[in-house]
Amino acid sequence: VMITPNTEKYQVLHQNIEDISWISEECLIMREEGSGTRKEAGKQLRNAGINLDKLKIIASIENQETIKKSVKQGMGISIISRLAAEEEAKSGDLLTFPIPKADQGRDINLVYNKNYQMSKSAERFIKVVKEVYGIEE
C-alpha cells in the first residue's frame, strides 16, 4: 500500500482512492536499492501504469519504522506492506492507498532442512509461520 500523512491534502485525495496518478508529483521515500520490498513496489507501480522514471525519490531507507516516522512527519510518501502499515492506519496516524491493479501479495518461501537439529526458537518460528499461513506438512 501507499502511505501518506493523515493531512487534509491526502484526505481529499483519499476520496478518489482508485486514482494514484498524483504520486509522480510527490516526494517518495523508498526502501534501499535491492530490497525485496522496493522491487515489489516498483512492480506494483508499473502494473498501475506509473512511470518509475518520473518518481521523485528523495530518500532510500533500510528501516520501515523510520520510513513510517518520516511519512508521519511529512517528509514524503512511501510504499510498504499493508501489514506493516496496519497499526498506524487504524490509529489514524497514516492514510493508506491501495495500488490499483496490484497483486495481493508476494510469495515468501520458508526453506529448512528437516534432517538438521534446529534450536527451539527456530522450531517455534517455523511452527508459528505454518499456523499463520495454514501450511501443512
Predicted regions and their residues:
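Active-site-adjacent beta-strand anchor residues
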Residues: 30-31, 60, 78
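Alpha-helical segments flanking ligand/cofactor-binding loops in enzyme cores
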Residues: 21, 68-69, 123
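Short beta-strand-to-loop elements that line the ligand-binding cleft
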Residues: 52-63
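Secondary-structure junction motif
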Residues: 10, 27-49, 119-120, 136
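Beta-alpha-beta core module
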Residues: 12-17, 65-114
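Flexible hinge/capping segments at coil-to-helix
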Residues: 3-29, 33
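A late-sequence structural motif
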Residues: 97-137
